[in-house]
């Protein structure tokens, strides 16, 4: 009964937001204008930033705002979606897969021992501020990520490049940090010398976290670079109205002739999925992410819309803070794992676009362990384990729920209510805690939670990005919000990271997954195939499995 009532309240809220969308307000901080009505999204973009020079203006609506526009300083997918348009990396991924292709480097060589990587850079490339892209710019960026004492690391201002530490074995001076030297051979040739092999070094070079920022912009903006991004990408930054919109304009001097095709891109925040769909159908926006799976069939049947499906490349999960009571108790974690009905969540909320998960790693990935036994939904076993944990009379806990829809969890509010209902059936009273997106990420990173909801989308096609990022002890307090620290797991992950034998790497990852499953620092819920939609005026749009696709080739039909 409680669940039905809560869903009714969510329904009322959705209706309110839909009405707000119909009046033209797509942001969280909407209010009436002096004339008593709101301008529509496109009019707001022009009013705030001036007219675009051409008529190719695309509005991309999403559920939440970006956290930072300094790519390496955040793991937030909504940030990477934007920085992908502004910046470029030495290498790029194929439009539809994680195949590594040339980027700012047109060619590269790898030594036989896997310890030297030489990149040959494109010539005649300029940053958006007019300065030259060269090998020294590459070196400056990698050094600032690796060295917290670097003048452009901005550590005193709270910058932490956790993803660099995860993907390159730590930071300057750390025992496992693999980048030993960076040698500028000439303006357009640079060599990376490694202390030991790294099985996914080239994939790292294509990730959205490690593109090249203008050194002149780092000097000019200092720690404000996260709000003043300057790269070499197809679009340049214009403005950012927090929790409302980010505006990018075509970079006229982009290195690839004929691109981009759009004159302007506006990334608009519309928190409610239903409101975004109303805006899409009305022509107010052109692309929406976070489509409710239940709405997919209706979109597919609509002649004015196009339905897209991303590859199954993510995990939606519930995580425990294992260093904090009461979830420092493994029996309690096992009890909760058995109490949550993953099948019901997958069937009720994903409309066939998800499969229940047993481990964090997606099934298509190398090293996926299909022999790990999932915690089956079993309330009786959950009650027994609850008693074993010392909570025969039940207990009260907090569940922190995500405030925005993400590709791995399009309706977090309802998921949290299902989990609340499941746990109360076995004697656990759940209080749902809600925060705005940026504070949510910060507070869970700081360990203020007991139990929380989040997810992870792959950005380089390698298992390490899931398992080490989420569960390696070195990442406690950053991407490891479970505060999970198991030396044996870390050793398997370290060995997998440093091997260039893919079969050996797969074995290490499989062994790590067995230990992780038994420790149960999280409840893997589902691997989803996120759906999104565009109007049929949008051409050449290809959604990437990473959720961060370039819009350089996209255009609007006349």
Model-assigned labels for residue ranges:
Residues 106-154, 191:
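Aromatic- and charge-enriched surface segment that lines or borders ligand/interaction sites
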Residues 223-226, 253-298:
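Ligand-site clamp/hinge motif
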Residues 61-112, 150, 230:
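N-terminal lobe/hinge region of extracytoplasmic solute-binding protein
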Residues 177, 187-188, 194-260, 264, ...:
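Gly/Pro-rich hinge or "lid" segments in bacterial periplasmic/extracellular proteins
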Residues 327-421, 485, 511:
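Append "and occasionally in soluble cytosolic enzymes with long acidic Gly/Pro-rich linkers
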Residues 387-460, 530:
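Ligand/substrate-recognition segments at binding pockets and active sites
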Residues 241, 340-367, 411-418, 443-558:
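Detector for C-terminal structural segments
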Residues 122-124, 249-253, 312-335, 339:
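A bilobed periplasmic-binding-protein/Venus flytrap-type ligand-binding module shared by bacterial periplasmic
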